[in-house]
Amino acid sequence: MDTNNQQPPPSAAGIPPPPPGTTISAAGGGASYHHLLQQQQQQLQLFWTYQRQEIEQVNDFKNHQLPLARIKKIMKADEDVRMISAEAPILFAKACELFILELTIRSWLHAEENKRRTLQKNDIAAAITRTDIFDFLVDIVPRDEIKDEAAVLGGGMVVAPTASGVPYYYPPMGQPAGPGGMMIGRPAMDPNGVYVQPPSQAWQSVWQTSTGTGDDVSYGSGGSSGQGNLDGQG
């Protein structure tokens, strides 16, 4: 009887491989890793739930996190593009904002796996490698640094990394999210990395831009003044 077609038991078939360099304990390591995946999925689900609610409530289309003039200039870099409607740069601005936010969250999850509070470029590379929708960035983001850092989650057995090029597992986004979740602060750029506040705030406070402080490090708003400055550039 041919045994090559035998299927593994459900408990083994449903376990995704952990990230490269991840260390788990020999006893209960699989359950611990599944719990980590569930927590990460809940955080991503909370992020997208809040973003959908925010988009539905938007009534200000004049001020944007990213300058529309810069986006329009990038769009016009394509010689085949002759005319651009007023709505197109607005949609691109929001799409770029969501792209940056999601990649930041996924990068922060990798930093937390490595017990760090500093988001580094190797975290961004890891987030790109483990997420198939970001595979178009693989060739422009160095991945060698991922191998240099061992993610220590506890003493025990080191699990072998997955095959190169295979995106790591995340549960489908459609799964219901449980309560709670990770919260991160606004990123502050620094030559040595992106410093992120510990997860102690609510999701709403994470993505809202404070208006009354002078030390706000969130992305600058586009507005008419920003557009005028960019239009004046060569």
Swiss-Prot record:
GO terms for molecular function: DNA binding; DNA-binding transcription factor activity; protein heterodimerization activity. Residues 209-219 have a biased composition (Low complexity). Residues 1-20, 205-234 are annotated as: Disordered. SUPFAM superfamilies: Histone-fold. Coiled coil: none annotated. Residues 7-20 have a biased composition (Pro residues). One of its GO terms (cellular component) is nucleus. Ubiquitous. Present in etiolated seedlings. Residues 220-234 have a biased composition (Gly residues). Its main location: nucleus. It is found in: Nucleus. GO terms for biological process: positive regulation of DNA-templated transcription; positive regulation of photomorphogenesis; regulation of DNA-templated transcription. Keywords: Activator, DNA-binding, Nucleus, Transcription, Transcription regulation. Gene3D superfamilies: Histone, subunit A. The keyword Isomerase does not apply. Pfam families: Histone. InterPro entries: Histone-fold (IPR009072), Histone_H2A/H2B/H3 (IPR007125), Transcr_DNA_Rep_Reg (IPR050568). Stimulates the transcription of various genes by recognizing and binding to a CCAAT motif in promoters. Belongs to the NFYC/HAP5 subunit family. Heterotrimeric transcription factor composed of three components, NF-YA, NF-YB and NF-YC. NF-YB and NF-YC must interact and dimerize for NF-YA association and DNA binding. This is Nuclear transcription factor Y subunit C-1.
